[in-house]
């Protein structure tokens, strides 16, 4: 085949594809719905592909008529179009699920996995492909452009959120740069939507506190932190605190394990991991939900971040008489900031008719 013939064939193929796409675009748009029957991207893709196969099998096993052939062809085109629409989200999901490997000077390999970003990918898929229109999917597709700037490191790497008990940090997956991550919101974002996000964050905090992060810590990391305690002549269990573990992880370049500070502290001290009863954990979450509206009502107009999660859980434990848990929720060291939180908390307690206990 000469060059001219090849070029003509390419042009013809391109014209056919363009025509098919134009037909696809002129089809009646699928109506938006409120709720999806799927809970994950994997489940959605598998479910839809199985549905296509069942429909095609039914047509193939039925009477072979011109009408059935046309329906089968149309169904195959719909399946192709579905895959074309879905592939970008599958790629985005897979990229976020890919295990990243970092090697230190001794060629020790540690596996790091981002756990917080794929939910957003699934929500965007639901909005664009499944046509699910609700608060969570809308929130996913209307993210501000500044979010991309926040989650991009100066070295070009991606900054990922790591939950450490009741605190979040942004950690670069390339150079390891760490910086505090403060959850903020604007007037455009609904209080209900932010409450949903905060409750999810609270659940992650409680999981981290109980060593239920779902991430295994390599023995090399635990041994390195243990060596730091030994170097600093810290041996008593009361001195092996999560805050110290975090300090040593940062020094050793293991900031990606911030979410495991309680687990590591327990592994070194030999103290069993804290376990909250289901009833108490549910009570914490219920109380947390109850304070959302009063907080929004009483927060200073210029305040953009929520109360410290440590502070909130400390107050919950205090109210419920769970004094043995107070040690797990270290409060802010700055008395002024602590007082500012007390001012808001006092108004929240008044609204909910809870007992107010002054912190400072």
UniProtKB/Swiss-Prot annotation:
InterPro entries cross-referenced by the UniProt entry: Poxvirus_VLTF3, VLTF-3_Zn_ribbon
Keyword terms, alphabetized: Metal-binding, Transcription, Transcription regulation, Zinc, Zinc-finger
ZnF segments: unnamed: 153-175
Signal sequence region: none
Keyword Transcription: yes
Pfam families named among the record's database cross-references: A2L_zn_ribbon, Pox_VLTF3
GO MF terms, alphabetically ordered: zinc ion binding
Family: Belongs to the nucleo-cytoplasmic large DNA viruses (NCLDVs) VLTF-3 family.
Name of the molecule in the record: Putative transcription factor B663R
Organism: Paramecium bursaria Chlorella virus NY2A
Classification lineage: Viruses, Varidnaviria, Bamfordvirae, Nucleocytoviricota, Megaviricetes
